[in-house]
Amino acid sequence: MTTKEFAKILQDKLTSEYGVDLSVASHQQIYRALALICRQMMSENHKKFQSKAIGTGSKQVYYLCMEFLMGRSLKMSLFNLGLNDAAQKALAEADISLDSIYEEEPDAGLGNGGLGRLAACYLDGMATTSICGTGYSILYEYGIFKQKIVDGWQQERADNWLPGGQVWLKSHPDQAVEVRFDGEIHENWDHGFHYIQHTNYNSVMAIPSDMYVQGYDGKGVAKLRLWQAKAPDFDMSSFSLGNYNTAMSKNASAELISKVLYPNDNHVEGKILRLRQQYFLSAASIGDIVQNHLSTYGTLENLDRKSTRLNSSHA
């Protein structure tokens, strides 16, 4: 892509999203416009890559992990899409440094350490080597924490990364998965078939949002599907009666699952929350994998076309 072509795409995006010209756009607006351009291109590339993989019968790989340390996406996305030089020159003509735009992006609050970095590298590696790969994790509202030292003491603050990072995410509420907690399981056999009935359960809806990882030199694209926990409905009856706390408690309990990466587990409540997070991720992801397979092939007889890996190298 030429500098002139990229400059037009960038200006069109700034106009449609913010109604501004490049010459007066803020650095935050330019960052978001560039992110949207990359996201759209990667989404289109992923659709083509996925269709080709299904058409050739390639095995699809799914990687589940509680964290993905993705870092910042703009620089790598522009580079892997082959747009870095064009973007740099287009901005330079407006006397804007691309490096200064990179600084507008927060680190994604989806990972913390080596486990998450390993997971992110697997996604990048699968995309670059043209393996049809999908990562699954939780869309944490807050990263683990931001550290600040005051008078020699550490103070922890919430890592509110979504205001700057959500531009990379595409929500798909139509593909939500119901995850059931608690309740009772009843099972019986009838004419050789095993029937399971789940009663008195509490439902939490797993709402997926997707972000993409472009492989180097445009070879392949990996998808990271992130689950956000939501209550299935709102208790309007309690709210109408003035029982506001009761009405909100169901929503708060559900949304707590995707609130914070690695909640403190030095107490029983924290241990329970971590267990709920792990079950939520597993149940939503397996449900999504099975549903996608049935939509594509109409049968589970060829489920060996899927390969699922749970990242358990770290306790």
Regions found by a protein language model. Give the residues of each.
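Extended, Lys/Arg-enriched charged tracts that mediate electrostatic binding to polyanionic substrates
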Residues: A25-M42, E141-L224
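Glycine-rich phosphate/pyrophosphate-binding loops
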Residues: Y122-D124, T128-Q147
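Generic, well-ordered alpha-helical scaffold segments in large soluble proteins
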Residues: K13, I37, M41, N45, ...
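Extended, charge-enriched "interface" segments that sit outside catalytic cores
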Residues: M1-T56, Q60-Y62, M66, R72-N84
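Residues forming anionic-ligand binding surfaces in small-molecule and nucleic-acid pockets
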Residues: A86-A108, L241, T246-E269
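Single conserved hydrophobic/aromatic residue that forms the stacking wall/gate
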Residues: K306, L310-A315
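Long, structured ligand/cofactor-binding scaffold of large enzymes
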Residues: H46-Q50, G57-S130
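Carboxylate/His-rich catalytic cores and anion/metal-binding grooves
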Residues: G218-L256, L275-L294
